[in-house]
Amino acid sequence: MIQRFDFNLTEDPDENGFQPFMSACILGGDPWEDVRPAIVICPGGGYYCVCEYWEGERLAMAYAAAGFNAIVVNYTTQGGGVYPRQIREVARAFEITREHAEEWHIDPHRIAVCGSSAGGHLAASISTLWNNEKVFTKEEIESRRMRPDATVLSYPVI
């Protein structure tokens, strides 16, 4: 059984009125035996849209079948805001996932990121810029809450 939890990634909608959010697909099971890795999925869409179904939900189900809890990020796209808004939204997905790690039976030290196309660009960006003071505050960097433990890129725009 899979439970789904949705969370807003920002307090306010973007410039187009879209509210960036994440959908956590959490596998059921014995919490004492089934602590799982997780993967934060950044679907592609050329920063024009987010291909939530093809590169988000379907990929989440494939990872779930392999024993991962999966988090799909629906980030700001064209006209909704400028960089680094999108990378900060992905970072927030990592923070929320780590905040709920115990409740969702996630190993907080085994949270990966994956992305394809524009989502691959975001996955590569959070993987290399999570400790960049031009993007994040010193406090955010020191907490290491948004640092991916592994990265999977599928035809990234880099």
Where are these regions (language model features)?
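A domain-start/cap signature at the N-terminus of enzymes
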Residues: 1-25, 30-35, 158
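Short beta-strand element of the alpha/beta-hydrolase
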Residues: 35-44
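Short beta-to-alpha linker loops that shape the active-site pocket of alpha/beta-hydrolase fold enzymes
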Residues: 45, 69, 74-78, 157
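Catalytic nucleophile-loop/oxyanion-hole region of alpha/beta-hydrolase
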Residues: 51-53, 73-108
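Short amphipathic alpha-helix adjacent to the substrate-entry channel of hydrolases
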Residues: 52-71
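Primarily recognizes the serine-hydrolase "nucleophile elbow" in alpha/beta-hydrolase
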Residues: 92-158
